[in-house]
Amino acid sequence: MVAEDAPVRGTCRVLFRTTTLIFLCTLLALSISILYESLIIQKQIMSQAGSTGSNFRLGSITDLLNNILSVANQIIYNSAVALPLQLDTLESTLLTAIKSLQTSDKLEQNCSWGAALINDNRYINGINQFYFSIAEGRNLTLGPLLNIPSFIPTATTPEGCTRIPSFSLTKTHWCYTHNVILNGCQDHVSSNQFVSMGIIEPTSAGFPSFRTLKTLYLSDGVNRKSCSISTVPGGCMMYCFVSTQPERDDYLSTAPPEQRIIIMYYNDTIVERIINPPGVLDVWATLNPGTGSGVYYLGWVLFPTYGGVIKDTSLWNNQANKYFIPQMVAALCSQNQATQVQNAKSSYYSSWFGNRMIQSGILACPLQQDLTNECLILPFSNDQVLMGAEGRLYMYGDSVYYYQRSNSWWPMTMLYKVTITFTNGQPSAISAQNVPTQQVPRPGTGDCSATNRCPGFCLKGVYADAWLLTNPSSTSTFGSEATFTGSYLNAATQRINPTMYIANNTQIISSQQFGSSGQEAAYGHTTCFRDTGSVMVYCIYIIELSSSLLGQFQIVPFIRQVTLS
């Protein structure tokens, strides 16, 4: 219930503050008008009866204006400071009370203790925020690894494989999923899906642990792939596609694979729907979830998506000649401007994938059970983002951000602030603003290695999202200084040396490599949160690590504290 009200509360704040600004502008106009009239009256009185009476009347008018301005200042303080603090306090109090009611009382005689799907109140108000100022971001370090029980199961045979994790966290709870392959790591033949939900609780040592309250194992013969998960009020929503052919064959097809939405509630209710978003058939050859988590926003669940667009369709023609070159490239690439533009334009089209245009976007679904034709596809404009790739959506306060995997020629971490336009209560368009950075590189081969800085066609890279620790909007120029954390593979061409880091736009500030040199790894997901009791910031780094004992990969959650030095 609280998660549903949070976006509405944010909208009400905006409306209230807008009304307040209009009221203040009206007061200012009236004040200027009164002052102007008083000056005219003063001149008339001075010319007729001297200055004594006029000074008295002017003083009365000045007192009146001071009273008006005093009221206006109080309104500004209440709307900008007092009211938001009161709302946050009330929300925290309500969530804490709900958790207390559901965990401290037995339902009836001899019943077991209840278990509410609500994080411990130490963390409720420390989730999905920017945690440090711009100045503090320059002095952050990674703490040591903290020993917690893993909430992620591993393969139990040498032939098995667990891959493609997706993790989502909100004020109330977390959701997690990964793919389970019984033999090898190729997911296009047969695989199952593990899903869990739970809460964050403190340990006796003071740091957090992740308690699993519900699990689900989807093993019904349906080959769900690349699933992206999002927390929703009371449970989890998951977006998957179904395919039993290699990725290249998906792109060479003329009809997109089956798209599915699965809603799992804490009360064991499960709803699964095959969705048919308008504008997909005959436009997209394939449409894939971004694997990274989605977000719940203004009554809609948003998921990252990408795929191949068919030539000469309306979407293809609308994106023609559009391209995006990150801001940092100008000082780092030796190509002339014309060559950069030409290569950047061609980077969105892949001959390997049947000359499809590789496009990123957002799948938006209302939170309801009848989803067959209700979900919408919102493509990004290609003059704002790079070639389509896996991705993740974040909520920082009321703002939506997007991570795009660096599959294309620019090997650095790609983060964007997203603006979503609503028309008649539905999301109708999206735009993206890039956070400029020349860190942190991903590995690739040939001309697409971690050292590449110039536009060209690439289809490389690895998923390695990052968490913003400072607000890019806090600087006079958006994103001119931003600090973020994550994990990356510290090598130019190979998927080896998993390393957790803190970085800003131009340099890595702090880093810790896991394992010995040459340790193989793959995908990495990072999420941070704050313990509002101790004011400590913790980050969970979920990394796919190669294993010589059980399966080709094991998915391991690492927790570290981010400290201000």
UniProtKB/Swiss-Prot annotation:
Disulfide bonds: 161-185, 175-236, 227-240, 333-454, 365-375, 448-458, 528-539
Catalytic activity line of the entry: Hydrolysis of alpha-(2->3)-, alpha-(2->6)-, alpha-(2->8)- glycosidic linkages of terminal sialic acid residues in oligosaccharides, glycoproteins, glycolipids, colominic acid and synthetic substrates
Compartment list: Virion membrane; Host cell membrane
UniProt keyword annotation of Membrane present: yes
Domain-level remarks: The C-terminus (head domain) is involved in binding the cellular receptor.
Record-level Gene Ontology MF annotations: exo-alpha-sialidase activity; host cell surface receptor binding
Organism: Parainfluenza virus 5 (isolate Canine/CPI-) (PIV5)
Source organism superkingdom: Viruses
Name of the featured protein: Hemagglutinin-neuraminidase
GO BP term, example: virion attachment to host cell
Similarity-based family: Belongs to the paramyxoviruses hemagglutinin-neuraminidase family.
Transmembrane parts of this sequence: 21-41
Subunit structure: Homotetramer; composed of disulfide-linked homodimers. Interacts with F protein trimer.
GO cellular component terms given for this protein: host cell plasma membrane; membrane; viral envelope; virion membrane
Chief subcellular location: virion
Glycosylated residues in this chain: 110, 139, 267, 504
EC number: 3.2.1.18
Keywords: Disulfide bond, Glycoprotein, Hemagglutinin, Host cell membrane, Host membrane, Host-virus interaction, Hydrolase, Membrane, Signal-anchor, Transmembrane, Transmembrane helix, Viral attachment to host cell, Viral envelope protein, Virion, Virus entry into host cell
Record region (Involved in neuraminidase activity): 223-228
